[in-house]
Amino acid sequence: MLLHLCSVKNLYQNRFLGLAAMASPSRNSQSRRRCKEPLRYSYNPDQFHNIDIRNGAHDAITIPRSTSDTDLVTSDSRSTLMVSSSYYSIGHSQDLVIHWDIKEEVDAGDWIGMYLIGEVSSENFLDYKNRGVNGSHRGQIIWKIDASSYFVESETKICFKYYHGVSGALRATTPSVTVKNSAAPIFKGIGSEETAQSQGSRRLISFSLSDFQAMGLKKGMFFNPDPYLKISIQPGKHSIFPALPHHGQERRSTIIGNTVNPIWQAEHFSFVSLPTDVLEIEVKDKFAKSRPIIKRFLGKLSMPVQRLLERHAIGDRVVSYTLGRRLPTDHVSGQLQFRFEITSSIHADDEEISLSAEPESSAETQDSIMNSMVGNSNGEPSGDATEFCKDAKPESPSEGNGVNSSENQNQEHAGPVEEAAGAMEARDGSNVSEAPEEPGELQDPEQHDTQPTLSAEEVAEGLPLDEDSPSSLLPEENTALGSKVEEETVPENGAREEEMQKGKDEEEEEEDVSTLEQGEPGLELRVSVRKKSRPCSLPVSELETVIASACGDAETPRTHYIRIHTLLHSMPSAQRGSTTEEEDGLEEESTLKESSEKDGLSEVDTIAADPQSMEDGESDGATLCMAPSDCSGGHFSSLSKGIGAGQDGEAHPSTGSESDSSPQQGADHSCEGCDASCCSPSCYSTSCYSSSCYSSSCYSSSCYNGNNRFASHTRFSSVDSAKISESTVFSSQEDEEEENSAFESVPDSVQSPELDPESTNGAGPWQDELAAPGGNAARSTEGLESPMAGPSNRREGECPILHNSQPISQLPSLRPEHHHYPTIDEPLPPNWEARIDSHGRVFYVDHINRTTTWQRPSMAPTPDGMIRSGSVHQMEQLNRRYQNIQRTMATERAEEDSGNQNSEQIPDGGGGGGGGSDSEAESSQSSLDLRREGSLSPVNSQKVTLLLQSPAVKFITNPEFFTVLHANYSAYRVFTSSTCLKHMILKVRRDARNFERYQHNRDLVNFINMFADTRLELPRGWEIKTDHQGKSFFVDHNSRATTFIDPRIPLQNGRLPNHLTHRQHLQRLRSYSAGEASEVSRNRGASLLARPGHSLIAAIRSQHQHESLPLAYNDKIVAFLRQPNIFEMLQERQPSLARNHTLREKIHYIRTEGNHGLDKLSCDADLVILLSLFEEEIMSYVPLQSAFHPGYSFSPRCSPCSSPQNSPGLQRASARAPSPYRRDFEAKLRNFYRKLEAKGFGQGPGKIKLIIRRDHLLEGTFNQVMAYSRKELQRNKLYITFVGEEGLDYSGPSREFFFLLSQELFNPYYGLFEYSANDTYTVQISPMSAFVENYLEWFRFSGRILGLALIHQYLLDAFFTRPFYKGLLKLPCDLSDLEYLDEEFHQSLQWMKDNNITDILDLTFTVNEEVFGQVTERELKSGGANTQVTEKNKKEYIERMVKWRVERGVVQQTEALLRGFYEVVDSRLVSVFDARELELVIAGTAEIDLNDWRNNTEYRGGYHDGHLVIRWFWAAVERFNNEQRLRLLQFVTGTSSVPYEGFAALRGSNGLRRFCIEKWGKITSLPRAHTCFNRLDLPPYPSYSMLYEKLLTAVEETSTFGLE
């Protein structure tokens, strides 16, 4: 009887664990392993200690600012979301009241979500409510928070977010709310050795799926979908189910065209899985035709295999489920039906990968724990459980090398293991088995190079790693099964590799494509992908083993599961259930149609298909590294809490996971196939997977494993596990919306990257052992305490590393990406705030200086006016644009301007605002990094500081890193060929703390070591050693650390190597304009000595005055004179050169003959005098082309357009006769300025004197400029004076004035403009600007500023979208302009234009407009409601729709801006330009760095950097002059602007998106551009000449960007 009772309890426990965790959405990260894939952080507010919320006084809740500021002075008119209380005690407090006051567009589908603090994905809400159907801008809702697995700690910080239903934009966020749960248990930790599993007899089931058909799928906007199925096997949701080789099986069905009721009749798919696995079926639209991409997601189904087995056992072969959705706003409809057949009996698994080192007594101890817990009536862990936590620790922890440890353990336990294996069926599930350990789970990152890897064949066939492994562990059917797994695996990898080689379009980025490492066998890759830390692995096979023990040997699957139901229903807790049979029937019905909103839960991995969370590595992920609290004890304790709570309702008033506001409280606990007694809240109210198990976990940021894969583990809490386990088939969206119920979705999948100091007590030896040479992970569990309330003696941020986890030396940085909402509890500096734009991106607002930035500000106080002077990079970039405009004009104006240039002074930044050296910027960045460490403890801060001072970090983050990279040809080729390496370098350069994540990556180590100079001595405190395999590693005695990276790499002293010094000098000197650089030689005294501390050139000169220059002086002269535009440069300072043909011949002779010619003419007086004027330029000049491409050689006889330094207006790229439509921008520009001068614009004699205060720049300018009349603005000269600063305005102060003013006026601070949807550096008029007080006058003022800058020839540091420039020119917008505003809308109209719509669409000339929440119908033309759209009139319909969409909400603003603009500029003069040319006139032309462009270009469709067509392409681009390159950039990206970070920071519609070239089209087609994706579709032209002509034609003779 006792034996039977133990068996029943074990069965109950395992059934509870299995159902609650395995029924889950698939773990997408298992198959989605692209190098650029973003993984998400999830922050816990407890990690930030800058604010003492627990003990400090409760301040008044501050209102967070929203996306728009509706008033220039006050802040009363911004969107707000407020909560009635900042503290909430579960079961004791009154319900929260959420108030909203939304100024932006609202919708009846808007919803409010409850999130953990720091959660950045809208999908990961804990709960959500619809705001109601009234569509009002103000309202409130009552919110009751119940005890659930989200609140297992004593305090949990949450916030509420208001989302717009249509666009998904975040409207407002509440301050943080602290939820107190007095009933939260406190658990003791378990030693890490107790995580060992009993292998037991895992049961792999072979089954087949066939007869698929779907009914009622969602129809597209204009067309039926082309559905296909993507079916995969994923491990159970919780980490107790390890990733095994059979996971990741994936099959895709054929595409059924143009139907909402597809039937896949001949499709038959076979899979092998465990009962705990999840079968995930996703229905997607292939988008096979030329149709607009609206949303390809049609629905998904995540079903536990065990659920299918139960249906099979009761005779159901054909099953039907309702498709689910991912977000509350997803529109999913339809059902999926298929046949499920078991093709083989349940048989033992051969998996030998997971660790298994559990002592024999472990399982028996668990039984005793179960006994004590079932009998325990309160929510606290029983004494036995506590004793188990203490006693079950091993006496002598194994330490040292992972493989050696494995061998020792195998030898030590060989005997007991064989006994256990032999009696495995007779021990009531208490199995003890010893499996060979997998090195991938044991070895540290540093050991990856030295430890043997387990090959796929060994895994598949179950071969032991060493000879001492007991052979009796391998069942007889292992070989057969292994071969089966191998057969399943090989085609999978092959198919994926083919997909990678083919290249995928943007719509395929949602697919699960594994990035395969070149040169590695596919099979080995499949296994290595699964080599992930499973630190807290409960026995995955206990469920099956216990069931087998209880049920006997000879059993069919049907009787097997019927027996399970019988046992479960006989459990004491099941009989205590209060649910009636009738209620259960209702629950089962509800389960079958339960809301597909929880299908957001179907994406187990939190890396969902959200485009903004992909790319760029902008969003960082986290990999778990489980702390000592073993899940075994945690599960039992949590289970005890659940059982106890069910018995003691008074002690725990709210134990259910359901919300009281939901009508279906009981439905969340229904268990399909079980009677009511099994579904009581006492059974599922609190889960064994509650996050209390993780209270002492630590998480390393995206542990990068040895195969360049991100390894992430997903942790989910209990309630949704239990709910999903009941059924993953959810009710229809309509039901959910009618009920307006709050449900609990996928919780925060990855907990805090830092430990809560109050939840961790631990030992100190860990951090000392982490840095042991060779990277051997400490195996000790001594001194590890369980998380308990009270003071902690573990240093913050440290993490006990288990025997199978990867060690880290410190925690990752918490730098938030700018497109995510920041952690609210991390304070911003005073007078700063974070706002979210209409695209969900976060930018930061400085209310003192009234500027915005994408970079999170630091806490250091900055003197007023310094920040507003702008970044040095931006000012330098603006100066480069000035330089190019001046060069453009130099041909015509060289002589007339030469006299005026002599009187100009070098602008000193208008009093120092624009100055500063790079060294200052670096120290500022360094201090910013240190300040960001404020939330860390002193000890951890010191460790992070040491890491940031390591040679590798200094090298990668140095501003001159790319200069050194270009000079190292072999490293440069490695860098350009490895996408993963680029990703790692970019992440480290953005935040140096990311280096901790990648420091052991083999590719990164080898890459950095390519720069090491082994001839040098090691730095002081460093030592080189050799491990037992002969591999060298380096010991840093200063920081007590070891590394494989050679410290003898360049840039350690902040300076370039000598042979690269001149290039740095050149780049910085050239960042000023040609006119200013010339002042260095002519005005050596006054202007430079006036304020040397703030002069950029003075700073550069002082910084490099001692550095030696490697080239001989004669070589520098020759290189300088070989510039293609040298004659124009020489004439700027010596105008007589134009008439001195003899001197010109001498220069040409030197250009042709080189040093030999210079030696002959070295005594020529005229030549020496001329060269003496350019002494500084010669000394600092180096030909960039030969420096970056050593293989290229300069030929003075070749086309002068081949240099990347060629500027517009100097050369022609083609000798052919210009076509009628060809634009001559240089001629237009010169003619425009000549006519302005002739008509007296800006010529005087009067002056517009603007006296500007730097601290009131915008207001002062507004008042003064708006006071002048139209005539005065047109005729008078402009004169700028900064208050309190001496100096005359010879263009310097005016230049800085427009620079600073444009940075303020055109940024989103005042709500007049907003960042465009395409990127984060172009702006457009904001429809929300109508809420700004006096907004029309502000737009009129903006127009006047644009006009003043134009006629006085100053540039603005602002880039606008193409529709904006068209609006300035009063040109009508066409369909291509819609791409900037609404990509999906544009593609839908494009599809209408390209296809015959006869009998397909039922449209009229009307459009639905939502005004203040009310939807009204508006006619596009008179009688439009009665006019059908046909094939004949669709062109008119498209034109009217485009006009409506472009002008919607900004008509008045545009008219006001045009009024101000044409008050200053004559419209007839401006009309000579088109929209792209006007952008160049207003914002200037920047010199394009071809090397940076090429290095940050991606290729698809078979192209690569060495492809012949690509080589021709870059040769053609190099042949272009700078204007043509700018036109090409405009053609592909939509703007000629390049972020000041370079091409690596180019952005697309949903985040970072580099310039991309894809193989597309026939050779007769012109290249095609996709501006939203920065992609150029380039046909594989057969010759260079054809490519050049086609490319030039596309760039210069097309008026639209997306040429079809």
Swiss-Prot record:
Tissue: Predominantly expressed in neurons of the spinal cord.
Catalytic activity: S-ubiquitinyl-[E2 ubiquitin-conjugating enzyme]-L-cysteine + [acceptor protein]-L-lysine = [E2 ubiquitin-conjugating enzyme]-L-cysteine + N(6)-ubiquitinyl-[acceptor protein]-L-lysine
Gly residues bias: start-end ranges: 908-917
Keyword Coiled coil: yes
Subcellular location: Cytoplasm
Entry EC no(s): 2.3.2.26
Protein name per UniProt: E3 ubiquitin-protein ligase HECW1
Biological role stated in the UniProt entry: E3 ubiquitin-protein ligase that mediates ubiquitination and subsequent degradation of DVL1.
GO biological process: protein ubiquitination
Tagged with keyword Lipoprotein: no
Recorded metabolic or biological pathway in which this protein acts: Protein modification; protein ubiquitination
Subunit (UniProt): Interacts with DVL1 and SSR3.
Keywords in alphabetical order: Coiled coil, Cytoplasm, Phosphoprotein, Repeat, Transferase, Ubl conjugation pathway
CDD domains to which the protein is assigned, alphabetical: C2_NEDL1-like, HECTc, WW
SMART domains: C2, HECTc, WW
Top-rank taxon, per record: Eukaryota
UniProt biased composition (Basic and acidic residues): 387-396, 494-505, 590-601
Modified residues (Phosphoserine): S871, S935, S937
Domain C2 per the UniProt entry, residue ranges: 182-318
Active-site residues (renumbered): C1572 (glycyl thioester intermediate)
